Amino acid sequence: ALGHTAEDLVTTFFMNILQSGRVEGMLPRAEYFGGEFELVRPLLMVEKKSIAAACRQWGLPIWTNPCPSASTSRRADIRAWMEQLWSHDKESRRKTYNALIRWQLDFKR
């Protein structure tokens, strides 16, 4: 299981559009190697702020990405762009998540 969040889903979606011209995100569940390996992302439709609130409530540690390039990557640039867009219209964050969640739930492989 991986800890990708709703923000990761949106970031990956925009990265795929801008870098490869593909309309694609991440699936909550994906099979690899002919179904021998299954990857799940149980937090894919949960916002980071909700995860952080739960961690605080349960006394769990909250950590940031330790990767040295985490703040200087293309992914970081896309996240900053999204935050800028969302800062002008608070509902746009929810609408973006909801649109991608509906797309993910409707998407069948």
Residue ranges and their predicted role:
Residues 3-7, 47-93, 97-98:
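Mid-to-C-terminal catalytic subdomains of enzymes
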Residues 109:
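Cys/His-rich short segments
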Residues 1-50:
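Active-site adenylate/phosphate-handling loop in enzymes that bind or generate adenylated species
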Residues 100-104:
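C-terminal-of-GTPase-core extension/linker across diverse P-loop GTPases
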Residues 22-23, 60, 90, 105:
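Generic structural signal for secondary-structure transition and capping sites
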